[in-house]
């Protein structure tokens, strides 16, 4: 056994390794080896069972040993710089391998059919390479023990599987980020133990097959970014499914019967489809739901009161629909990490999310995934037909990061309770019918990076302190009675008719001048602090103190001799003032 993972920086294989012949486990991961694949290591150590070379700088082709190696069980060469083709006979030379991970390299060409000779293979990960062609039929027939097949982010194409399919124990199938076409193969129905099915970011067409709802072990289904069409299947869910990603397809129909019974759902993403009808009341039974993404559809009617029963919600995106009525004052949005700290976090909910979710933040659509989602929360109700006042209770969402209520018909004033949104980074209330002034309490929102109240009926002076001094004119335009920086107009300009506004025009920038007293005070404090820091450094460090006084002495002597040698010249042109 030899384990040097992450302990030393080698650059090359240790020389003593060339003289080892009875090793069973070798782990040389994370030590930046910059050579080729050590086929000699397999040739010298016929009893070797585990070989881990993860995250190095190994390059060149994958060279097989000279003879069959029947004892190797685990081979992991992920996250290196290997290139070229995967050896066509790899399955013949390594017939008893159970785990193969070659992800994160530069392999190209087709997947060798000889993988089908690995009858004991349980995990095959070839993701994040440059592989092309189709999935070999012999692989789907011969790898009878395969549990995980991960081919994500390559250039594979064609039909996913042929009819001759024998992967009955398959539990995880990830084919996302390729160019597969055709429909979802019926042969997957035989994978009764399938837990994860990710076919996203392909060119798959057709309808969602009804039998996917009968796969009782299925927990994660990702069909997003395809060309799937047709109505949402009715009675689709079994109780085990937790994450459902169907965004950016051509799905249509009503939600009424589609997902009833999916009571363990944590993620429901149906954004960018043609879903119609209303949000059904039974959604309030999804007690585990954390991410509800229904934006960019044709959903109408009011927001159901049952949404208030969902205490685990982190992200709510109902934007770009036809929702009407008031905003529910009981809506919730809290990050998973906050619920965990608060003691109300559900242990069954995931700490991190592997699949990305799109959410608009700071006017830009971002993809969030992994642990980032656990620390993120937001509500987006923009681009609907919502009416009424903004509930003051929304200000109680003190852990929310994004709130977007723009492009509705909301009335009333901006609630002063928004000053409690201590973690908010983006607040968009633009294109409504809000009136009154901008509450001065909002200047206490220290993390606010994007603020937009444009095209309302707001009035009064714009706050010009703290982060509000950084927002530009686009945040406030379209409000006739707002004045101050950065709109470059004051209250006098608003009260006078245009023909008599010369005085206000001449003074329109007066509110934008820098306070000179504050500038002088801050400059003086900064200057004193710099002197104190220099004095502290010289006091603490004897070496620098000695260097400092030596430098002063040398400078004084130079100045003295300069004056003596050039006294006449300096007197004539009065350069004595220059030395002061």
Q: What residue ranges belong to the model's regions?
A:
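Terminal membrane/secretory targeting segments in land-plant proteins
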Residues: 492-580
């Amino acid at each position: 056994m030899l384990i040097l993972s992450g302990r030393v920086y080698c650059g090359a294989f240790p020389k003593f390794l060339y003289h080892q012949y009875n090793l069973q486990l070798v782990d040389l991961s994370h030590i930046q080896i910059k050579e080729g694949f050590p086929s000699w290591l397999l040739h010298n150590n016929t009893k070797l069972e585990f070989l881990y070379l993860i995250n190095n700088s190994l390059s060149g082709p994958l060279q097989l040993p000279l003879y069959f190696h029947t004892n190797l069980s685990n081979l992991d060469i992920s996250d290196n710089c290997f290139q070229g083709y995967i050896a066509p006979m790899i399955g013949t030379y390594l017939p008893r391998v159970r785990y193969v991970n070659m992800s994160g390299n530069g392999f190209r060409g087709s997947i060798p059919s000889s993988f089908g000779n690995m009858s004991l293979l349980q995990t095959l990960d070839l993701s994040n390479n440059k592989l092309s062609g189709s999935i070999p039929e012999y692989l789907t027939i011969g790898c009878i023990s395969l549990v995980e097949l991960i081919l994500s982010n390559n250039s594979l194409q064609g039909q996913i599987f042929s009819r001759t399919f024998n992967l009955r124990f398959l539990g995880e199938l990830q084919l996302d980020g390729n160019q597969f076409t055709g429909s979802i193969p019926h042969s997957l129905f035989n994978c009764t133990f399938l837990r994860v099915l990710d076919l996203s970011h392909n060119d798959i067409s057709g309808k969602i097959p009804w039998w996917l709802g009968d796969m009782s072990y299925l927990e994660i289904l990702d069909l997003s970014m395809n060309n799937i069409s047709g109505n949402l299947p009715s009675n689709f869910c079994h109780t085990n499914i937790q994450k459902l990603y169907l965004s950016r397809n051509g799905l249509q129909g009503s939600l009424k019967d589609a997902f009833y019974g999916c009571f363990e759902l944590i993620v429901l993403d149906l954004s960018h489809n043609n879903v119609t009808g209303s949000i059904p009341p039974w959604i309030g039974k999804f007690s585990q739901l954390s991410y509800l993404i229904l934006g960019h559809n044709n959903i109408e009617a009011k927001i159901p009161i049952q949404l208030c029963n969902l205490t685990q919600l982190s992200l709510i995106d109902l934007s770009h629909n036809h929702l009407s009525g008031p905003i529910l004052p009981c809506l919730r949005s809290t990050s998973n990490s906050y619920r965990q700290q608060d003691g109300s976090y559900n242990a069954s909910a995931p700490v991190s999310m592997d699949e990305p979710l799109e959410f608009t933040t700071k006017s830009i659509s971002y993809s969030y995934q992994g642990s980032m989602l656990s620390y993120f929360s937001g509500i987006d109700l923009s681009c609907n037909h919502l009416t009424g006042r903004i509930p003051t209770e929304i200000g109680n969402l003190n852990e929310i990061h994004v709130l977007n209520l723009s492009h509705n018909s909301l009335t009333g004033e901006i609630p002063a309770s928004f000053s409690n949104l201590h973690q908010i980074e983006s607040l968009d209330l633009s294109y409504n019918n809000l009136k009154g002034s901008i509450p001065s309490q909002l200047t206490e929102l220290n993390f606010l990076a994007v603020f937009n109240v444009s095209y309302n009926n707001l009035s009064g002076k714009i706050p010009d302190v703290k982060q509000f001094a950084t927002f530009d004119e686009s945040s406030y335009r379209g409000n006739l009675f707002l004045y101050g920086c950065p709109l470059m107009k004051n209250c006098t300009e608003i009260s006078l008719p245009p023909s008599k506004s010369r005085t206000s025009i001449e003074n329109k920038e007066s509110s934008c001048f820098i306070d000179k007293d504050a500038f002088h005070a801050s400059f003086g404090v900064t200057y004193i602090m710099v002197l104190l820091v220099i004095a502290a450094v010289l006091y603490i460090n004897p070496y620098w103190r000695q260097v400092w006084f030596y430098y002063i002495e040398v400078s004084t002597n130079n100045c003295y001799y300069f004056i003596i040698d050039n006294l006449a010249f300096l007197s004539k042109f009065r350069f004595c003032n220059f030395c002061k």
